[in-house]
Amino acid sequence: VKNMIIRVDKPSGKVSFTDQSGKVFLSEKAGSRKLVPDTVMGEPCFMAEQSFNSPADEYLFGLGQFQDGHYNLKGVTRQLIQVNSQISLPFMYSNKGYGLLWHQYGLTDFNPADNFIDLEKQEQTTGNDQMKEVTTTSGTQKVSQNQSLYTGKFTVPEDGEYSIFLDLGDMGNRQYVVIDGKPIIDQENLWLPPTAGALAQLEAGEHEVQVVCKADNNPKLSWNRKDNVTTFRSPHTQQLDYLVFHGPSADSVIASYRDLSGNAPMLPRWAYGFWQCRERYTSGDHLVNTVKKFRERNL
C-alpha cells in the first residue's frame, strides 16, 4: 500500500487509515466490530457488523442503483439486495478521498434502523382498487393494485434529523409514509423494490405516522437517529471483511477498485447494432420464429 498507512490500536482493536502525512481519512468506531455466530437454513454463519466514524462534513456516494433519489448517503438507511429495477453494490466513495468495499455477497443493511414502530392496518382500503397489466413470471397479466392504509405512533428522545426506513417485505406499487401530515417517502410505480429510506427533521416527543402500500404487502417501519457514524451489517456471512481504497482523486479510487475487481471486456464489433429487448419469449418456437424474422429482414 503506497498511499496509506494503517494503524491498529491494540487495547481497543480499532483500525485507522491515514495518508502519508499522517492525516486520518477513515477510522473504525472503537468497540463497534461484531462477529456473532448464527445459522441460516440450518447452516452455521455469522452476523458481521462494523461502524466507521463519519465527520459532519462527509459526503458518501454509491451503493448501486436505487429508486430512492438520494445523492449523499450519509445517515441514510438502505437494504442492499438485488431485485428487479434495483442493483446493489456494497461500494461507496467519500469526499474525504477514499473508497470502501464491504466485501460481502449476501444481504447487507447500511445504517440499519433498529427502532420499530407498531403499525395497525385500517379496515378500509385507500379506495383505488384497480386492475393493471403487470409483468409476472407467467407473462403479462392483470393484477389487482389495491392499496391499504396503516397508522401508528412513535416517540423520539430529542430534536434532530432521523432516518426513516420502510420495508414492505416484497416488491410493491406504492411507498407512502406521512409523519404528522408531511409526506416523507412518496413513490409510486409498478416496479418498486421492497424497501425505501428517507431523512426527516423531527422534534422530541410523539409523532403520528401513516403508511400506504399495496394491500398484500406486510409493511415494517423503523427509525434511527442520524449521527456521525456509518454502519454496515450483514446477517449471514462467513467473516467480517472490507477493503479500503485511497485517492488522491475519485478517478484513482475507482481505478484501484477496477484493478481489483477486474476490467469488463469490450463487446465484439459484431454484437453492436440493433438490439432487441422484450419482456420474454414464451416458448422455444416463439424464440426461433423471432430469429427467423430478424434474418428475413437482415437485422
Task: Spell out what each predicted region is.
Residues 274-284:
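Active-site mouth loops of central-metabolism enzymes
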Residues 1-142, 146-153, 159, 163-268, ...:
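Catalytic and substrate-binding clefts that recognize carbohydrates or anionic sugar/phosphate headgroups
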Residues 267-272, 299:
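Loop/turn elements at helix/coil->beta-strand transitions in domains of secreted/extracellular proteins
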Residues 87, 286-299:
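Catalytic domains of carbohydrate-active enzymes, especially glycoside hydrolases
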